[in-house]
């Protein structure tokens, strides 16, 4: 009779708590006598707090075995056994580790901004390399021009020293003079012949 009455009382209390489920959280505790007699069930209700790390006063003194596995920032379920009774508790962990990991990733992705010293060193290196290239090009051009000038001088110095060049020029000039004299003599002969023919014709008339 004692157990039947206790069960009926439990069902009545559970029905009442279903209507007030939004304002209170039921926790069931079971007590057993050490002498092996019949145990009675008792229900206690405690208000639910909005704090995620809130632990009821009835559960504060009981040992709990929390599992070490779980995702950061989410609830970690843990189960414990005390005096033959099983219970499940739900504990929330603040998401500090996730925020720290995100901040570390953002810091790693941010590239260091170039400073004025690095910009100046890069600019100086570019100017120096440009000047060196210009100097090399000027040296090459000066060498090419000097080589051409030397080649021209050597050719001019070799031309007057060639054997037979003066004789050829003199022979060409004498040949030209002889041609001119021959043409003059032939013209004189033609004129003289024409004069003689005209005189003979006049005499005949």
Swiss-Prot record:
Keywords on record: Angiogenesis, Apoptosis, Cell membrane, Chemotaxis, Cytoplasm, Developmental protein, Differentiation, Glycoprotein, Membrane, Phosphoprotein, Signal, Transmembrane, Transmembrane helix
Protein name: Endothelial cell-specific chemotaxis regulator
Function statement: Regulates endothelial chemotaxis and tube formation. Has a role in angiogenesis and apoptosis via modulation of the actin cytoskeleton and facilitation of proteasomal degradation of the apoptosis inhibitors BIRC3/IAP1 and BIRC2/IAP2.
Annotated compartments: Cell membrane; Cytoplasm
Expression (tissue specificity): Highest expression in endothelial cells. Also detected in vascular smooth muscle, macrophages, lymphocytes, and mast cells.
Segments forming a coiled coil: none
Record keyword Transmembrane helix present: yes
